[in-house]
């Protein structure tokens, strides 16, 4: 009751409505104002009376031209009295210093410790200022539509349309604007201030305040709101960012705000425990040698996720055993290569049946979330250059999505290099034509040729050269749907000499272009070499047999085709093969690669051919019994055929 009467007297004696009486459990709403130091008005002098001392209150001038009055209880420190008033304004005692205004000396003030007994200051005027070495700026708000998943840093609710500070990254709804902290702080500098108070004080010329102690830091962490312990975004509690200075010693000007929610971290990690942060700080304070300081940034993050992007050379020296600990940690999402998510552990794939082997590897049927095809490549002990080149090509292959392309599902690098693709129940085109001798009709053969050209046109649009185009790598999936496989992978289909990649003739001899056989260029593979191989596939479709079947010597075929002495015999094409298809086969297997058409032209030619094929139109007089509205409308006698009438 005495506190209430004292507060009322204080207000009635001239403090006005702008002053607030603060209790330890009271709370007021902060407002967004321009940031500049508070200046006392001349009218404020002399307003204090002896009633302030009798009411156990202290008048405090705060930054950003704000002021308040707090009640003092016995046993409370200055930190305890002002903590609530600072917190609701988005301020931290660790960022501020408190001074006692000297009444006998106008304009002078004496610095106080945050641990000072507040009872000894009853009736005094205090002033809270920002520390000189705490970088402060005004907010730079801009309206923003958040297309990616985002949450308000005030109410923690979903945020679509709102505002965002361009400097510190603080984002909020429009109706939450009154609760935004008034100061805009580079929190990476605050981390330096907390962890290296001695160096910071020496640089700025201001002695470090005694409140910067481990006990104060632990108290600040322990007072973290319960809601913020489950989220990584809170403007009222410090999060220790591990962004380190660059080699020039200057901090980045656009550090990511600690108030921005890390949604992917929330879904994959446990809530932040304050004890983890305390242990990290304690381990840092105990390490006094430079080598210990160089390895400490990896341990400062409570989740172990943040890593410096440009580490200084001293940070590369790691303590023994740190490598094994880092292997057990989850790699940070921001630092991961995108191909990381496509790498499959060998223990997750179960190999069953061996399907066959080729010049570049062996294919197995396996189980990995269903049936898959696993091609183990014939690369023994890959060098780091080969492994990196393999990953680079996998990064291209994983972006392929087409109805006529085998779906790439992942890759493996442990023990052996392997590619995992979708499993096709159907057989290859080679098996259909030359083993099972399936009899396709002409329109089916033309449709297979069209789908193959369509898939190759897609690969070339992605700048992927197949290098091994043949009927063995064309699969008929679920009927007559064409799937092209074993494309790309120049790393595997080339010969390596040390760290240098050397091109060599690859693929089966019958489908190799003359310039590939000759190997006169450093890289003879091109879009036209794929067109030649496609022309041989067209020859297989339109003849049902392989080219050069009259030559049994492989070396002779290589010599004659490479020299230009031999070419596929076009007289063996089917008699009912359209003339446009015959011309297309002849154009694709031309000896000069510049004279061969590219796949956009090939695809348009086949599509025109399909439209020009004669079709049997449906007879207008043919009865459509299934279209009848009611079965009783159809006379039953019309459904029975008289034996005297001929049946057509």
Curated annotation (Swiss-Prot):
It is found in: Cytoplasm; Cell membrane; Mitochondrion; Nucleus. Zn(2+) 2 binds at residues 152, 155, 173, 176. The modification Symmetric dimethylarginine is found at residue 563. Binds 2 Zn(2+) ions per subunit. Residues 275-285 have a biased composition (Basic and acidic residues). A zinc finger (Phorbol-ester/DAG-type) spans 138-184. ATP binds at residues 355-363, 375. Gene3D superfamilies: 3.30.60.20, Phosphatidylinositol 3-kinase Catalytic Subunit, Chain A, domain 1, Phosphorylase Kinase, domain 1, Transferase(Phosphotransferase) domain 1. It catalyses: L-seryl-[protein] + ATP = O-phospho-L-seryl-[protein] + ADP + H(+); L-threonyl-[protein] + ATP = O-phospho-L-threonyl-[protein] + ADP + H(+). Monomer. Homodimer. Heterodimerizes with BRAF and this heterodimer possesses a highly increased kinase activity compared to the respective homodimers or monomers. Heterodimerization is mitogen-regulated and enhanced by 14-3-3 proteins. MAPK1/ERK2 activation can induce a negative feedback that promotes the dissociation of the heterodimer. Forms a multiprotein complex with Ras (M-Ras/MRAS), SHOC2 and protein phosphatase 1 (PPP1CA, PPP1CB and PPP1CC). Interacts with LZTR1. Interacts with Ras proteins; the interaction is antagonized by RIN1. Weakly interacts with RIT1. Belongs to the protein kinase superfamily. TKL Ser/Thr protein kinase family. RAF subfamily. This is RAF proto-oncogene serine/threonine-protein kinase. It comes from Rattus norvegicus. The gene is Raf1.
